[in-house]
Design a protein with these regions (language model features):
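Short, charged phosphate-coordinating catalytic segments
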Residues: 1-10
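A short linear hydrophobic-aromatic micro-motif
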Residues: 11-13, 96-97
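Catalytic-site neighborhood detector that most strongly recognizes the C-terminal catalytic loop/helix
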Residues: 15-19, 121-145
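C-terminal catalytic core of Y-nucleophile DNA break-rejoin enzymes
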Residues: 16-40, 48-80, 98
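Alpha-helix C-terminal capping segments
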Residues: 26, 44, 107-113, 143-144
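Short, basic (Lys/Arg/His-rich) helix/loop patches that form interaction surfaces
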Residues: 49, 72-119, 123, 138
Length: 145
């Protein structure tokens, strides 16, 4: 994503997987963290001149300052940060959450706020949105008799 993808108070995104074009309002707020999309984007601006929202801030082996950060690099950095956080995971946890799990978490968070997550996530079917909204066994399921 680039800063040039922002106009008329929307972040314009063309999804890689489906090609769906989304215009997400900058005033979209995630109540769980108390930030709007505009707040997050403002944090992407720093002392490094770059057309990219997510960019390298200094020159190193993976790229020069201002260059685009590839998705695989973001996932790797997420894994490193997750591992350094020293979180105690349940003993029955068979797989630690990957970077992509944030998409499911945001789906559940925005749905609780009454936001149309099917459109927000760029899904064509409600079934796909339901899959992303799965609570991963966190909530008790009541048996109805």
């Amino acid at each position: 994503m680039k800063f040039s993808d922002i106009w008329d108070n929307y972040l314009h995104v063309t999804q890689n997987k489906t090609g769906m074009k989304l215009a997400i309002p900058l005033n979209l707020k995630c109540d769980a963290i108390g930030l709007t999309l505009a707040d997050v984007i403002s944090k992407c601006r720093d002392r490094v001149v770059s057309p990219y929202l997510i960019h390298h801030v200094k020159h190193h082996a993976y790229g020069k300052a201002g260059s685009h950060v590839p998705e695989k690099t973001i996932s790797r950095y997420f894994k490193e940060a997750r591992d350094k956080a020293n979180i105690t995971w349940p003993k029955d946890c068979t797989a630690l959450p990957p970077f992509h799990e944030q998409r499911s978490l945001s789906s559940r968070t925005y749905k609780a706020q009454g936001i149309d997550v099917k459109t927000l996530l760029g899904h064509k079917t409600e079934a796909m949105s339901v899959m992303y909204g799965d609570d991963r066994g966190l909530e008790w399921k009541k048996v109805v008799i």
